A protein has these predicted regions:
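Amphipathic coiled-coil/heptad-repeat helices and related helical stalk/stem segments
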Residues: 146, 171, 195-196, 273
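Conserved glycine-rich, hydrophobic/aromatic-active-site segments
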Residues: 94, 98, 178-272
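Cysteine-centered catalytic environments shared across enzyme families
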Residues: 1-184
Length: 273
């Protein structure tokens, strides 16, 4: 894999774009494809790029004519209908992932809203369809709020809960290996990947679970980061959500997928349906 930052062999320039580490190498975004052809001397070139395989319609309800175009705006600002639709979509996103795997399931649980919602839905679905408890895992420093609140959520959901207590030294020591696993030097991505990698390593070594649910994507989708409170208006809020989602495969999804997959596990992110 190409993971260097230096352009070769002609120029010794560092690329400041953390999305594409090499200036002469371009990534093909997920869900797209490029068409390569040869010229008259047999040299390959990109004829078409970033062609989309499939794109989900804005609203399946609108596409199914269940909502008339004239009443679309009323539908969008109807809080009750919006919340009901969001809940239905999230429940279906969890259900289809639970029902299409025969491998043991576990959930990453930080005690926050996003992971707790996913854990609750997964626990309910597994209990109703398989009659089993799910395993939940939380990682954190001794005395951290994550451990405390995850413990409370796990108790409420009646899960088989495990805590991985680590030290600051454990986190720092894991950074070189994490960089190799996720193939990224992006500071925020690396920092956020360490916990994912360590908890996944623990699961891989101590559990039969192979399919790992998490709450990734909710902050980008719902504007969950603290700086969203500074948005000037709903339009700017929405623009920032769309910007984050358009690049999420370079950062949060990359972190979630590679740090978990590097331990032989499969990540599931229902919020990103």
């Amino acid at each position: 894999m190409l993971t260097g930052l230096v352009v070769t062999p002609d120029k010794n320039d560092v690329n400041t774009d953390t999305i594409n580490a090499l200036k002469t190498i371009k990534q093909v975004p997920p869900g797209t494809y490029s068409v390569l052809k040869t010229n008259i001397i047999g040299k390959w070139f990109i004829n078409e790029q970033n062609l989309v395989f499939h794109r989900q319609p804005f609203s399946t309800l609108v596409c199914q004519n269940e909502v008339q175009q004239s009443s679309l705006m009323n539908y969008l600002i109807d809080e009750t209908s919006t919340l009901s639709t969001m809940r239905s979509y999230l429940e279906n996103a969890v259900k289809k992932r639970v029902c299409t795997t025969e491998r043991p399931i576990a959930c990453l649980l930080s005690g926050g809203l996003d992971s707790s919602l996913i854990c609750a839905l997964v626990a309910k679905e597994v209990r109703e369809t398989q009659g089993k408890q799910i395993e939940t895992y939380c990682i954190g420093l001794e005395g951290s709020d994550d451990l405390k609140y995850a413990r409370e959520v796990a108790s409420h959901l009646n899960t088989l809960h495990y805590e991985i207590v680590v030290t600051e030294k454990d986190f720092l020591s894991a950074i070189p290996e994490v960089i190799r696993k996720i193939e990224s030097y992006d500071t925020t991505t690396v920092r956020a990947s360490v916990g994912n990698y360590l908890v996944s390593k623990y699961i891989s070594e101590n559990s039969s679970a192979k399919v790992i649910f998490n709450g990734d994507g909710a902050d980008e989708l719902m504007g969950g980061y603290l700086y969203f409170h500074k948005a000037e208006d709903p339009i700017e809020f929405d623009k920032e959500c769309r910007r984050l989602l358009s690049h999420i495969h370079f950062f949060d999804v990359l972190r979630s997928d590679k740090s978990i997959a590097s331990c032989g596990l499969e990540a599931r992110t229902p919020f990103l349906d």
